[in-house]
Amino acid sequence: MKIILIIILILSFNYTKAQVKNQNNDFEAPLKIPLILSGTFGELRSNHFHSGIDFKTNQEIGIPIFSPASGYVSRIKVSPTGFGKAIYITHENGFTTVYAHLEKFNEEINQYIFDKQYALKQFSLDISIEKEKFKIQLGDTIGYTGNSGSSSGPHLHFEI
């Protein structure tokens, strides 16, 4: 009986893992600089829990942000508060990534937003984008880091 219990115990350790490593490598890094965090997921803020992670940009504005996977732009927000300029990308793997506090979007999206703001005669926007409008490939520049919205310094707010 003891031998059977020992065998079961040994076998159970072979089939359990505390964490399963992601074998798919679904995403690349959104920045081509060393990734240093200035804010972590779930940390307590003055009136909410932080919903993503913040990457430091060495106090620089305008560092290119790259799409970590292929997909399409599904939402764009522009506001003087909150996320400021933010872009949402829905990826082929079913995940959506969010990039916030941007200085600006890429040229094509910037022009689209500029035209929308003038057509609607308003600065603040929250637009759902049709799937075919802005196709994004892995590594495409989607915007540039900034300090827009309710931000205390240049950085990239990133969510998956």
How should each PLM-predicted stretch be described?
Residues 100-102, 107-138:
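Aromatic/His-enriched, Gly/Pro-containing loop or helix-boundary segments
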Residues 153-160:
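Histidine-centered catalytic micro-motifs
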Residues 18-96, 103-105, 132, 137-138, ...:
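Surface-exposed, glycine-biased beta-strand/turn segments
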Residues 1-25:
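Bacterial Sec-dependent N-terminal signal peptides
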Residues 92-93, 114-117, 156:
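Short, charged/polar low-complexity linear motifs in solvent-exposed/disordered segments
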